[in-house]
Amino acid sequence: MPSSLPGSQVPHPTLDAVDLVEKTLRNEGTSSSAPVLEEGDTDPWTLPQLKDTSQPWKELRVAGRLRRVAGSVLKACGLLGSLYFFICSLDVLSSAFQLLGSKVAGDIFKDNVVLSNPVAGLVIGVLVTALVQSSSTSSSIVVSMVAAKLLTVRVSVPIIMGVNVGTSITSTLVSMAQSGDRDEFQRAFSGSAVHGIFNWLTVLVLLPLESATALLERLSELALGAASLTPRAQAPDILKVLTKPLTHLIVQLDSDMIMSSATGNATNSSLIKHWCGTTGQPTQENSSCGAFGPCTEKNSTAPADRLPCRHLFAGTELTDLAVGCILLAGSLLVLCGCLVLIVKLLNSVLRGRVAQVVRTVINADFPFPLGWLGGYLAVLAGAGLTFALQSSSVFTAAVVPLMGVGVISLDRAYPLLLGSNIGTTTTALLAALASPADRMLSALQVALIHFFFNLAGILLWYLVPALRLPIPLARHFGVVTARYRWVAGVYLLLGFLLLPLAAFGLSLAGGMELAAVGGPLVGLVLLVILVTVLQRRRPAWLPVRLRSWAWLPVWLHSLEPWDRLVTRCCPCNVCSPPKATTKEAYCYENPEILASQQL
């Protein structure tokens, strides 16, 4: 059989990432609102019809109706209880990461020579937020250092950008709980990816612009100059009021310790609170409690009338590292269990008319000519809910499972997540207004920079519908990740750990070394993206050889060889989908080019 491939060889039948993405592109490129699918295919982006298979209410007897009502009440209580424990597990998870990484985070922030490099500042913001699992904690460190004159506002801007990127890791971790079902995982992971893609695209535009013009710094200065500011009351703490009774029985941390470590004023080497109050004069005691050594004393100050804290680790002799590992394992176990329960209960509750009503309310659009208004109302709703919860991580972690079960579409989740970015900066603004008078202006300027950064991102990637690039990119990423589930783990490791660490290491060597290595790599990636887009949209503009990637080794343009390698290393087959979902394909090139060629 003749072949157009080099060497007259037909490759082994595979389904690679290019085939999957190309199919998605063809579906999105049609003028109809319904995707064009091959025969026998189902569109995973279409919200599934959650049909009610139970017996109609009118046909039930009195006992059956009582059982139905009791079951509904129990499901509602189970859903609320699972959601409560899910939120508490996120709080404990954040405490665990702070115990494991806060000392490192504080030491990293001390190095002003490294922070003067914008790329290094960005990477440090990503790494620290990933370590402590809390954008509020990372922002508080930056605000404290700016107020203490250890950092300038200009140096803090790239760090704030990195904090914004690092906060999207939580929703990605949550989406992994739905990896058991291919379509649910595709929708859930695309929802988590759209948040990270938006943040990275905004950074790619604004970081060079800020380095050249100091745009965000000047905007924040103008806003401060035009406003009449007075200290306000402390920001509301709605969510903490609900979670504190449980989480404070597990562990309590010294919230000022991380900032003290970063500013060099640390007096106690342990983050765990052992004394929560005093009724007498304190007496000084020696402390040798370390992160990796035994604790001989709990605090550097021992009250005359001791009022010990009441939590599981109040009297522990374990190190911060050991306590952090215990909390990490326990919180992850509870988190995964609650997510499984939430997804199962949502699948059980959201049936028939209930599902239709919920979908209609969340995904509704206004009639023409006001159809564009629905997305902006979703932005406001996301900002308001995040402000009420005071946690963007909790809000995004709640949206992702709803996307997986088919309640929220990707097009509606996108503005909700953008609103969440705005909502978390509003909380920071109120917290800055509650700062002491001598620190209020510095804290407020950093909070305003965070706000303007997210607002600029919305103007860039949402205001003009044609520029809403994170949505198709997240769809394509979801297609590939659903086919090769191990890609999700690679994305987490590369996007939030390995690549930031590599960039940080190069920045330590110097700006010239970073530019010498990073410049060609970034240029190569941009060139590959440009050629790939032209292959699919305008292949006639390219030389014949560049109209496909078939001339490259298969492992450079297909994930199939890597999938076989991962499958051999993962005998439980968790990293790969069932064989029933695998289809055959005989080429990797652009189908428009090969349409007239004989294989």
UniProtKB/Swiss-Prot annotation:
Expressed only in the kidney. It comes from the Eukaryota. InterPro entries: Na/Pi_transpt (IPR003841). Pfam families: Na_Pi_cotrans. Keywords: Cell membrane, Disease variant, Disulfide bond, Glycoprotein, Ion transport, Membrane, Phosphoprotein, Sodium, Sodium transport, Symport, Transmembrane, Transmembrane helix, Transport. Residues 98-111, 210-322, 389-445, 507-510 are extracellular. Signal peptide: none annotated. It is a multi-pass membrane protein. Involved in actively transporting phosphate into cells via Na(+) cotransport in the renal brush border membrane. The cotransport has a Na(+):Pi stoichiometry of 2:1 and is electroneutral. It is linked to Hereditary hypophosphatemic rickets with hypercalciuria: Autosomal recessive form of hypophosphatemia characterized by reduced renal phosphate reabsorption and rickets. Increased serum levels of 1,25-dihydroxyvitamin D lead to increase in urinary calcium excretion. This is Sodium-dependent phosphate transport protein 2C. It comes from Homo sapiens. The gene is SLC34A3.
